[in-house]
């Protein structure tokens, strides 16, 4: 019976599973069926055999792989194609043209099949509804059109432009790789916030382009020509502008007929070219060239302001917003993808658990089946018998074997095993010992040191030494590897990642040695293999915890970055192929000119050029060539710039910033990882200790019989844990892990408080000063008081500033110049002052021995150093001593003394110091990588960068004597020149020079030039051969990706994260997040804005007109039209065209003047000029008038003047400076008015100003840095001769302070900073200025540390402070838009002024509802919010209510902020308020107590609040509605109880007209009425209470009756209190009225045993269901019942 049951149950379970399985597939199939339309192309149904066939093919994986393979093959075909100039071709290209037809057929077939399968366009899942399919279809159609056209029209039609679209096919590979889609999705999601920024960038570009057009139009067309021959002056192979700044030499004149710089591309002649030039400047490439050209033409008085402001605003601020948005979006996208993955895993886990449960059920059911007991007994007996027989046989065999075999071998084997185990144990102990660890580290560094000694022209003995030491180190590291393998066993050894890495390095090194000695491999391959040795350097990371953590996080990043690199590669391939199609073979301009190295003539070269543009280095030069290739500016060529701009924006701004986004994201992960590890570390070490002890015990007890687990497994466990927790050295604990930003940073506030100036000033340190002055000594007390007097401090600060300014005023050329002598006298005075201050402080605080002594503070030591340096330089005032020169330079550290005297500045400096400490590990890893690449570079390129000035000579031995040189390729101008054998400025002849070269490459400056020098490099002592080793480009690309894209971005990311964390430290103990703090700060500090409303009827009408939205829009449109007319100007425009533009300008000026007059009439003087925008408008109108008048006068003067050409020219020159160059700006400034229009732009502008407010100390630090470096630059490099063709010339030098600052600003933007560094270094071609007192050696070795340190400080640290601030303030662009932020709150102030025009700071509580309904969420309720819902929200807001029915501005704004951000709104409201008050006092210490009482209520029960008032109103409203519904039901059989209830309700509702008017405030009517603009204040509570008191008396018997009949409890409470009011009628005051109302509400709430002030609790009480005579009546819910007021 049981046997029969069991299979049935089992079958049932299996049948269930079978039943469920097809359902799932069916459902999936169903989904797919849904995607298919019933008919495709109006005729093919789902049962059509052709369509079924197409669906099968399209859905198969094989087809998908085939198409991807075809795309890849198509890419290869496009890459093999070689473009030739002038339409030439070769056999390969012709073959490829034929193959193109095959590809076209395949892609067309795919397209047709998919259209048949999916339908064309009408259905939701149809073919063209998918973006990738649309792209395919577009490419196929273009391909067919281009093929048809090329066959039909044989000549005169170029289809190349159409064919170029083929290169978009590789984009389809993205749809095949999921990891690519995460990166691409995050970029696409970022497009919406990026669009906001794009508009801002466009706005900045347009403004600067129009200013440039007005100021510099036609200025760059003058150049020097010979007076007689008419030849251009071009000593330096390129022409430059002449004019005020650059005077032509004798024999030459300045003529106005030059096309302009870069073949006329770089100029401001029309709006288009002006925009292109501005965009180029914002990308920081070639902006100094444009500036210097303008300065040559117009002088250098003010032009730099235009360019410097453009760079700061455009490049540093606006462009960094892109970075902020991308990093925000990427982390959001990553989190989404991670959550999606986690959810998927959870679902899979649930599915597995479900299946497991099914199986368990099946198993348990199977266990229930009892087998036949008799059969079981028989089976057992049979088994036992078999076992018995076998064991007897075995015993007999064993006895025989023991007798035959001697046991000696076995005992020996055991003995040897025991010894082996002991040796292994000893080896393992040795391998894990401190000594072994330090020995290996020492060997690694020695090996590294030996590798670093390699250099060009090294002696033979060094070669041999390196060879032998290499063999020695290989042997040692091999021994280490074998020892570890033996002690840990193979499995134990290879389980560690570092050991696998070691093994790889050792095997690589051995194979390299074998290949080198047998000469089987080419030298290039060997030199790369040799560098595998360098990876040993990373063995350090195994033992250094913080480093190993960083390396681990970097390895994690590589997974994310692999997909980005794939996308980057795809991007480069597509643009490379497109470049080949468009520009291939076109970069040949003149026969005598050499073709530019960056071109698109082959696929390989095209990839290199695109990669160069991607890095941004000299992208503008390639663009100029592209424009010239199509005929230049004066033809179709200018369109070519679109390709380069799109490539630059997508590549440089978007893709490369995603690198940074990934870096920051992974660093955050590493941070959390480190914290967890740190917590677990002690536990792991404890476990280790226990395991080791247990293992030893087991060994001692069991002797020979140690289990496999004890020998192998425990070792493995222990080893793994040792690997993890690093119990190697106690010193390691002193190092924090990578993520220890918080630990390190957290020490800062403590340090800050310890060094707080005020606390130091309080007491004299205990102990004697200089063993003379005790702490009670009067003289010491006097000194202490004097030092700490505020006036004394201010005086010293002024002295510091003046003495610093004098350092900047010195003449660097002549030390004995009269100006310097005067300044030196002042210097003596300031040094005396500083010495006196120092002595006073030393007496006051003591020198060094006791706590609080002067020298115990780092900042005081800085003071001491500066004063000592000044004293030494005065006493040894002889210029002969070079040490004194250096000491005089050190005086420039004086401004740093100001840091100790300005708290904010000190905080920023400490923040930077913390950042530098935190970044130490990253710097170390970067240096290790840099060092590795430098050694590889030395292997590859040492001694190979030499060249002869005569290109025909390849070797040094041939490079002697003279050669003929044709100037500008003109055969009529031969010149004799000496041959010179020169090394390149940057080379790899030794490791130090290689690291310098690589550092410049990592800054992206000048690397393409270096790349082509490397490609042409031949062999040691050999000259260049064109394209000799193209493969070496891989070295630079790998270096740039690893170091510049990845490591530098991680570095920058870490700086940003550290600065942001540092900012948070101040508030780490308060419970508010950053957004909540910002919003509360805004609410506390905000003030209402005055809104003037005239009383005179005519003036009111004018006011109403100018404040209306239609007037605003019309002005907006006029500004837009004005912008268009300003942009219509161009160089050499006809006379009549200029007159039209002038007339239009007059019209616009008249219109804007009318606007000014109307507004002045409406607002009067005081109110008009009270608004900053109005003042700005007035200045513009005034400036425009002056501009018109001035221009007209000058035009008439020129027309009337009957003079010779020379004096006319003079008149023109005089007029341009003021008229055009200044007053024309007022026309452009009208554009800025656009910023006041539009909420989005207003928000951006507000955040921008806020960013600037957050930057004063950062800006001060930058100013100080620039000042110090500029003065050092003047002192050290000021004597270098200004020479044309070098980087130190008339525009770029250190001879004056402003010039030095400009050079530094240029270096900070990275504009060829390495060229300036080389021009200041000690080289033979660096000459001294003839006016200086120096004869030679004007270059200095200080140039290298000077420029490198400045670049690192500026580009990596200081500029990133800007980025950190911007990312902090603009995070709302990527944040969820529904979260309230400070940027929303400006709208509240603006709309409040409509209800409170006099800015009294209070409005009627009734107006608050309409105000908040006007404001969109998240700040307000929005127009769609039902009126009653708005009242409910007001209950939760609960601001204090004044006796006249008004609420206060700050209280309302605070409540508006507090509710959406849920700032202390949970739990008991009184406790929450108390906590919030304490928090506000803690963070904003200077908050006015009265203001605090207004915004956060005290726990006083007697306070009347909006919450209590609207609670009362809502209770009434609910009852009114309840009664109305009951009346409508029209029940006739109402009992007396029902009548009583109605009476109670009527009592409430119809108390008096005054009650209805004041308490309900006609709220129902108000909901439908138009929002009132302004209201008059009137009293409220007097009327409420008098109306209550005038009502008829309610007897207590009535109340008792009501309570007996189970009526609504809080209604009874209300009525009881009504009686109480009647009894105390005579003694009630307005104050007690307030109290009684409040008590009523509180009593009614106490029914449920809780006192509420929050919306949720209020709603709980309201929804109480009253019972009446056994029937249950549910109060109506406004959400469900009130349909007319729904959202």
Swiss-Prot record:
II repeats lie at residues 420-667. Glycans are attached at residue 90. Residues 81-99, 146-157, 217-302, 455-467, 516-525, 584-639, 810-826, 878-885, 942-1030, 1130-1143, 1192-1219, 1278-1343 are extracellular. Predominantly expressed in the larval body wall musculature. In adults, highest expression in thorax followed by head and at a lower extent by abdomen. Pfam families: Ca_chan_IQ (PF08763), GPHH (PF16905), Ion_trans (PF00520). III repeats lie at residues 777-1059. Keywords: Calcium, Calcium channel, Calcium transport, Glycoprotein, Ion channel, Ion transport, Membrane, Metal-binding, Phosphoprotein, Repeat, Transmembrane, Transmembrane helix, Transport, Voltage-gated channel. Residues 1337-1378 are annotated as: Phenylalkylamine binding. The chain crosses the membrane at residues 62-80, 100-117, 131-145, 158-176, 197-216, 303-327, 435-454, 468-487, 497-515, 526-544, 564-583, 640-664, 786-809, 827-846, 855-877, 886-900, 922-941, 1031-1055, 1111-1129, 1144-1163, 1173-1191, 1220-1238, 1258-1277, 1344-1362. Each of the four internal repeats contains five hydrophobic transmembrane segments (S1, S2, S3, S5, S6) and one positively charged transmembrane segment (S4). S4 segments probably represent the voltage-sensor and are characterized by a series of positively charged amino acids at every third position. Belongs to the calcium channel alpha-1 subunit (TC 1.A.1.11) family. This is Muscle calcium channel subunit alpha-1. It comes from Musca domestica.
């Amino acid at each position: 019976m049981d046997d029969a049951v069991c299979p049935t149950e089992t079958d049932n379970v299996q049948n269930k599973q079978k039943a469920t399985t097809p359902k799932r597939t069916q459902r999936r199939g169903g989904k797919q069926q849904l995607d298919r339309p019933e008919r495709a192309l109006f005729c093919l149904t789902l049962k059509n055999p052709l369509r079924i066939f197409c669906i099968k093919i399209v859905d198969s994986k094989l087809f998908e792989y085939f198409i991807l393979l075809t795309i890849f093959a198509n890419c290869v075909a496009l890459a093999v194609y070689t473009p030739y100039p002038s339409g030439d071709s070769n056999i390969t290209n012709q073959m490829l043209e034929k193959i193109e037809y095959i590809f076209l057929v395949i892609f067309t077939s795919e397209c047709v099949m998919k259209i048949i399968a999916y339908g064309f366009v009408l259905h939701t899942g149809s073919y063209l509804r998918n973006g990738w399919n649309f792209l395919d279809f577009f490419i196929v159609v273009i391909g067919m059109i281009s093929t048809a056209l090329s066959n039909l029209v044989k000549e005169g039609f170029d289809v190349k432009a159409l064919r170029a679209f083929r290169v978009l096919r590789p984009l389809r590979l993205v749809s095949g790789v999921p990891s690519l889609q995460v990166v691409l999705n995050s970029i696409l999601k970022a497009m919406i916030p990026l669009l906001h920024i794009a508009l801002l960038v466009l706005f900045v570009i347009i403004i600067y382009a129009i200013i440039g057009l007005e100021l510099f139009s036609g200025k760059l067309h003058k150049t020097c020509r010979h007076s007689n021959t008419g030849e251009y002056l071009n000593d330096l192979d390129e022409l430059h502008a002449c004019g005020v700044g650059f005077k032509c030499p004798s024999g030459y004149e300045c003529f106005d007929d030059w096309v302009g710089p870069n073949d006329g591309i770089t100029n401001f002649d029309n709006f288009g070219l002006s925009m292109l030039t501005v965009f180029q400047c914002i990308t920081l490439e070639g902006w100094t060239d444009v500036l210097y050209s303008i300065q040559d033409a117009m002088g250098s008085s003010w032009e730099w302001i235009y360019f410097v402001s453009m760079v700061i605003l455009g490049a540093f601020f606006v462009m960094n917003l892109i970075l902020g948005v991308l990093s925000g979006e990427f982390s959001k996208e990553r989190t989404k993808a991670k959550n999606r993955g986690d959810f998927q895993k959870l679902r899979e886990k649930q599915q597995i658990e479900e299946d497991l449960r099914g199986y368990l059920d099946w198993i348990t059911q199977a266990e229930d089946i009892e087998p036949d007991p008799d059969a079981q007994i028989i089976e057992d007996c049979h088994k036992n018998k078999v076992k018995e027989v076998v064991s007897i046989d075995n015993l007999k065999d064993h006895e025989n074997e023991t007798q035959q075999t001697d046991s000696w071998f076995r005992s020996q084997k055991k003995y040897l095993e025991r010894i082996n185990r002991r040796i292994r144990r000893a080896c393992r102990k040795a391998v894990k010992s401190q000594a072994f660890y330090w020995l290996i580290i020492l060997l690694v560094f020695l090996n590294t040191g030996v590798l670093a000694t390699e250099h060009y022209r090294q002696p033979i003995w060094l070669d041999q030494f390196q060879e032998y030491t290499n063999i020695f180190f290989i042997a040692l590291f091999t021994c280490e590897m074998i020892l570890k393998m033996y002690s840990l066993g193979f499995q134990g050894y290879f389980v560690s990642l570092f050991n696998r890495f070691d093994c790889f390095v050792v095997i690589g090194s051995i194979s390299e040695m074998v290949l080198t000695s047998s000469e089987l491999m080419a030298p290039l391959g060997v030199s790369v293999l040799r560098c595998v040795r360098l990876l040993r350097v990373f063995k350090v990371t195994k033992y250094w915890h913080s480093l190993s953590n960083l390396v681990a996080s970097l390895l994690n990043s590589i997974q994310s970055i692999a997909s980005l690199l794939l996308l980057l590669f795809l991007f480069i391939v597509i643009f490379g192929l497109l470049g080949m199609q468009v520009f291939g073979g076109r970069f040949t301009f003149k026969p005598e000119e050499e073709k530019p190295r960056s071109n698109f003539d082959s696929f390989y070269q095209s990839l290199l050029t695109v990669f160069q543009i991607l890095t941004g280095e000299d992208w503008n030069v390639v663009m100029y060539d592209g424009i010239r290739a199509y005929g230049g500016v004066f033809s179709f060529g200018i369109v070519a710039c679109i390709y380069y701009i799109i490539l630059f924006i997508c590549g440089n701004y978007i893709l490369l910033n995603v690198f940074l986004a990934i870096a920051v994201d992974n660093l955050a992960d590493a941070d959390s990882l480190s914290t967890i590890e740190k917590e677990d570390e002690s536990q792991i070490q404890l476990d280790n200790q226990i395991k080791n002890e247990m293992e030893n015990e087991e060994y001692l007890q069991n002797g020979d019989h140690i289990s496999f687990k004890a020998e192998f497994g425990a070792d493995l466990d222990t080893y793994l844990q040792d690997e993890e927790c690093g119990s190697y050295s106690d010193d390691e604990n002193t190092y924090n892990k990578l993520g220890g930003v918080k630990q390190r940073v957290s020490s800062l506030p403590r340090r800050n408080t310890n060094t707080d100036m005020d606390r130091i000033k309080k007491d004299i340190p205990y102990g004697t000063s200089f063993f003379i002055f005790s702490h009670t000594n009067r003289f010491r007390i006097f000194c202490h008081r004097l030092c700490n007097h505020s006036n004394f401090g201010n005086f010293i600060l002024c002295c510091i500033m003046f003495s610093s300014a004098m350092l900047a005023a010195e003449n660097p050329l002549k030390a004995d110049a009269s100006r310097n002598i005067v300044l030196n006298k002042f210097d003596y005075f300031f040094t005396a002052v500083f010495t006196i201050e120092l002595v006073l402080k030393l007496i006051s605080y003591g020198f060094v021995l006791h706590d609080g002594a002067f020298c115990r503070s780092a900042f005081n030591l800085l003071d001491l150093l500066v004063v000592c340096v000044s004293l030494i330089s005065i006493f040894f005032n002889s210029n002969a001593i070079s040490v004194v020169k250096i000491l005089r330079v050190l005086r420039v550290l004086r401004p740093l003394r100001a840091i100790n005297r300005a708290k904010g500045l000190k905080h920023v400096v400490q923040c930077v110091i913390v950042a530098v400490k935190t970044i130490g590990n990253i710097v170390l890893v970067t240096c290790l990588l840099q060092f590795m690449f430098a050694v590889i570079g030395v292997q590859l390129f040492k001694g190979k960068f030499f060249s002869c000035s005569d290109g025909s000579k390849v070797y040094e031995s041939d490079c002697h004597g003279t050669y003929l040189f044709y100037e500008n390729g003109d055969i009529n101008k031969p010149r004799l020149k000496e041959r010179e054998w020169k090394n390149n400025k940057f080379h790899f002849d030794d490791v130090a020079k290689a690291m310098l070269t690589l550092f410049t490459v990592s800054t992206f400056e000048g690397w393409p030039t270096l790349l082509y020098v490397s490609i042409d490099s031949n062999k040691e002592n050999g000259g260049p051969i064109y394209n000799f080793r193209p493969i070496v480009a891989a070295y630079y690309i790998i270096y740039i990706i690893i170091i510049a894209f990845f490591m530098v971005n991680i570095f920058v990311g870490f700086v940003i994260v550290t600065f942001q964390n540092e900012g948070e430290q101040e508030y780490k103990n308060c419970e508010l997040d950053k957004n909540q703090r910002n919003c509360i700060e805004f609410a506390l500090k905000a003030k209402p804005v005055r809104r003037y409303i005239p009383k005179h009827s005519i003036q009111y009408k004018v006011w109403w007109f100018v404040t209306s939205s239609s007037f605003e829009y019309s002005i907006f449109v006029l500004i837009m039209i004005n912008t268009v007319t300003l942009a219509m100007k161009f160089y050499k425009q006809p006379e009549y065209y200029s007159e039209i533009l002038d007339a239009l300008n007059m019209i616009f000026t008249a219109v804007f003047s009318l606007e000014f007059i109307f507004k002045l009439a409406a607002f009067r003087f005081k109110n008009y000029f009270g608004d900053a925008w109005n003042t700005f408008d007035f200045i513009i109108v005034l400036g425009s008038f002056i501009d018109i008048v001035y221009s007209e006068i000058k035009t008439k003067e020129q027309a009337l003047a009957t003079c010779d050409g020379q004096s006319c020219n003079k008149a023109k020159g005089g007029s341009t400076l003021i008229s055009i160059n200044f007053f024309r700006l007022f026309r452009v400034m009208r554009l800025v008015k656009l910023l006041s229009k539009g909420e989005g732009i207003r928000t951006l502008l507000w955040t921008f100003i806020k960013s600037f407010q957050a930057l004063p100390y950062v800006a001060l630090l930058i100013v100080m840095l620039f000042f110090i470096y500029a003065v050092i630059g003047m002192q050290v490099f000021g004597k270098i001769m200004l020479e044309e063709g070098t980087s130190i010339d008339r525009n770029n030098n250190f001879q004056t302070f402003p010039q030095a600052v400009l050079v530094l600003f240029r270096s900070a933007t990275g504009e060829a900073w390495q060229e300036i560094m080389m021009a200041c270094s000690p080289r033979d071609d660096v000459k001294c200025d003839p006016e200086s007192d120096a004869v030679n050696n004007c270059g200095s070795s200080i140039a290298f540390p000077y420029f490198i340190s400045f670049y690192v400080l500026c580009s990596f640290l200081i500029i990133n402070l800007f980025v950190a601030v911007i990312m902090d303030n603009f995070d709302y662009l990527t944040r969820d838009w529904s979260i309230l932020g400070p940027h929303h709150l400006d709208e509240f102030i603006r709309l409040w002024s409509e209800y409170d025009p006099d800015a009294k700071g209070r409005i009627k509580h009734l107006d608050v509802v309409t105000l908040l309904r006007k404001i969109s969420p998240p700040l307000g309720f929005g127009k769609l919010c039902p009126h009653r819902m708005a009242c409910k929200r007001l209950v939760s807001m609960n601001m204090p209510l004044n006796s006249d029915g008004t609420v206060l501005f700050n209280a309302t704004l605070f409540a508006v902020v507090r509710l959406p951000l849920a700032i202390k709104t949970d739990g008991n409201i009184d406790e929450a308020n108390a906590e919030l008050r304490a928090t506000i006092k803690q963070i904003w210490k200077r908050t006015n107590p009265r203001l605090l009482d207004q915004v956060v209520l005290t726990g006083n029960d007697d306070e009347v609040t909006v919450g209590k008032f609207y609670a009362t109103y809502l209770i009434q409203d609910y009852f009114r509605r309840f009664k109305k519904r009951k009346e409508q039901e029209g029940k006739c059989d109402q009992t007396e109880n029902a009548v009583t209830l109605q009476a109670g309700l009527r009592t409430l509702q119809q108390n008096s007209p005054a009650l209805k008017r004041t308490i309900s405030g006609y709220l129902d009517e108000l909901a439908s009425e138009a929002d009132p603009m302004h209201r008059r204040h009137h009293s409220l509570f007097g009327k409420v209470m008098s109306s209550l008191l005038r009502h008829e008396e309610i007897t207590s018997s009535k109340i008792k009756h009501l309570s007996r009949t189970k009526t609504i409890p809080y209604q009874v409470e209300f009525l009881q209190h009504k009686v109480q009011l009647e009894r105390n009628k005579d003694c009630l005051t307005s104050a007690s009225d307030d109290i009684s109302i409040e008590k009523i509400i509180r009593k009614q709430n106490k029914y449920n045993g809780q006192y509420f002030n929050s919306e949720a609790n209020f709603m709980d009480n309201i929804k109480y269901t009253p019972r009446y005579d056994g029937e249950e009546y549910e109060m109506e819910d406004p959400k469900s019942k009130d349909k007319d007021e729904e959202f």
